[in-house]
A protein has these predicted regions:
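Glycine-rich nucleotide phosphate-binding loop and flanking beta-alpha elements
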Residues: 30-32, 49, 70
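Short amphipathic alpha-helix with an adjacent loop that forms part of the alpha/beta core around
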Residues: 14-15, 48-57
Length: 86
């Protein structure tokens, strides 16, 4: 398995509008509602057990408030065959 590609918050802008990418905000709903990256969908880390519902044909770009949840989720998703960045 290769390493997880990490990106900065600044680099997140590069993925906005890319139809081959799904941006996922892993924070809880309250944090997402208060502020989130335009175009991101909210799937709290605790609810990410719906792996089957994620598109296998897109790169998943994950973010959270500190980076630790997104790295854990990225590792889990990579093991299931998804292309991910955190």
């Amino acid at each position: 398995m290769t390493g997880i590609e990490t990106i900065s918050a600044h680099d997140l802008d590069k993925y906005y509008g890319d139809r081959n990418v799904m941006i996922i905000d892993l924070r809880d709903k309250e944090e997402y509602d208060a502020s989130h990256f335009d175009g991101a969908v909210n799937i709290p880390y605790e609810e990410l057990d719906i792996f089957e519902a994620l598109p296998a044909n897109k790169t998943l770009v994950l973010y959270c408030d500190r980076g630790s949840a997104s790295l854990l989720a990225a590792r889990e998703l990579m093991q299931r065959g998804y292309r991910v960045k955190s």
